[in-house]
């Protein structure tokens, strides 16, 4: 039990330490702002030992708290990355360079090509699809002349991998509500 108490005292910095090196050497290892305050305030080695012990006990209290991430400090002004979706309705092929730039900036792009000439729209889709492939992105047709292009950080998935096919029934003419003419004539002739 005594060994544990000695360890506790040593850990908290209360046990007698070997003679401190000359004050000039110790002060020179401190950051400039702290060095000036310590010398001006007239702190001796006892004050430094006390503050070290205080820091050690704070560290022990934090680590004994049980949460591993309790000592993580967020950087002020740094926000977590957010995803951005850009909706474009280009009118010419010249705007495709901007689409590629958005993808390089890891932004998702939805392109509505209904305003473009069909031949130029096909050329535009081919161009952006090539750029998307080059950056390991993904592409998906989501409607008539509407396409989704995503960077490699975004995965595109559909609820089911099978394409839903409409039910195909053989074409039948509906059953008439009135009797056919032939049957009607037979029934009238028998009366």
Swiss-Prot record:
Gene Ontology biological process terms from the UniProt entry: division septum assembly; FtsZ-dependent cytokinesis
Predominant place of localization: cytoplasm
Mitochondrion found in the keyword field: no
Cited InterPro entries: Cell_div_SepF, Cell_div_SepF/SepF-rel, SepF-like_sf
Compartment(s) of residence: Cytoplasm
GO annotation, cellular component aspect: cytoplasm
Pfam families to which the protein is assigned, alphabetical: SepF
Keyword RNA-binding (UniProt): no
Keywords per UniProt: Cell cycle, Cell division, Cytoplasm, Septation
Organism domain of life: Bacteria
Region (Disordered): 1-77
Quaternary organization: Homodimer. Interacts with FtsZ.
Family classification: Belongs to the SepF family.
Record function comment: Cell division protein that is part of the divisome complex and is recruited early to the Z-ring. Probably stimulates Z-ring formation, perhaps through the cross-linking of FtsZ protofilaments. Its function overlaps with FtsA.
Protein name in the entry: Cell division protein SepF
UniProt organism field: Synechococcus sp. (strain JA-2-3B'a(2-13)) (Cyanobacteria bacterium Yellowstone B-Prime)
